[in-house]
Design a protein with these regions (language model features):
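ABC ATPase "signature
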Residues: 217-218, 226
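ABC ATPase NBD coupling module
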Residues: 65-78, 102, 226-227
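Conserved catalytic motifs of ABC-family nucleotide-binding domains
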Residues: 153
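Catalytic Walker B motif of ABC-type/P-loop ATPase nucleotide-binding domains
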Residues: 157-160
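Helix-to-loop junction immediately C-terminal to a conserved catalytic motif
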Residues: 48
Length: 245
């Protein structure tokens, strides 16, 4: 369980995240949606302390996320970003093995985990493991990025616009892959997106951010049926395609 309690982030006189409180249940997907500058990415990054809050507390399974050093916390939380963030001079297998290696896993355990994840993502380990990121398609790079984020078996996976750079067909496949992987591993996922349709499709609950404030946090059906503000209603109405509940 992730408990966010009164989290605020200010830069000088600018409040980027303003007194946000929410609870994310274990083994669920929470999507955070909002326009550019709404504070959604800053909120996400305060969970793994890439950004330190000005005030408030974030608890992971009851423990304050400041109770361990930041680098140690980040090794226990998966993190996937738009554009995959792969190391260009490391092979696919080496990229996926990054965090398990830092955690001191033995070679056989690392290989087994890399092979498992590559197979789950329909990437043959023998064929794709030795390749470099530039030898992959955009969709394949994205899959490797998520596999790397999951490699150390984290209970929590943070995703910042992970599918934003993909074309619509590949993006749909990536979303379905994520739902299947989440169901298999039971990972708690927090995913930031600017796309309300994606938020509805993937999220067990949706957090809508506007100007640093959490304006609604509810299940997709409730967001669609009873938007809490004109801003939420505008986001719901902005999609040109039907929502899939």
């Amino acid at each position: 369980m992730i408990e966010i309690e009164g989290i605020t982030k200010r830069y000088d006189e600018t409040t980027v995240v303003d007194n946000v409180s929410m609870v994310i249940e274990p083994r669920t997907i929470a999507t955070i949606v909002g326009t550019s500058g709404s504070g959604k990415t800053t909120l996400l990054r305060m969970i793994n302390r890439l950004v330190e809050p000005t005030s408030g507390v974030i608890k992971l399974d009851g423990a304050d996320n400041r109770s361990v050093p930041g680098y140690q916390l980040r090794r226990s939380i998966g993190y996937a970003i738009q554009g995959h963030g792969l190391f260009p001079h490391r092979t696919v297998a080496q990229n996926i093995a990054t965090v398990p290696l830092l955690l001191g896993w033995d070679r056989d355990r690392i290989k087994a985990r890399v092979d498992e994840l590559m197979t789950l993502y329909q990437l043959d380990p023998q064929a794709y493991g030795p390749r470099y990121p530039h030898e992959l398609s955009g969709g394949q790079q994205q899959r490797v990025g998520v596999a790397r984020a999951l490699a150390a078996e984290p209970n929590v996976l943070l995703m910042d616009e992970p599918f934003g750079a993909l074309d619509p067909i590949i993006r749909t496949k990536a979303q379905e892959d994520l739902l299947a992987i989440q169901k298999r591993f039971g990972t708690t996922i927090i995913l930031v997106t600017h796309d309300m349709e994606e938020a509805v499709h993937l999220g067990d609950k949706i957090a809508v951010m506007d100007a640093g404030k959490l304006v609604q946090y509810a299940k997709p059906a409730e967001i669609l049926a009873r938007p809490a503000s004109g801003f939420v209603e505008t986001l719901v109405g902005a999609s040109e395609r039907p929502f899939r509940l």
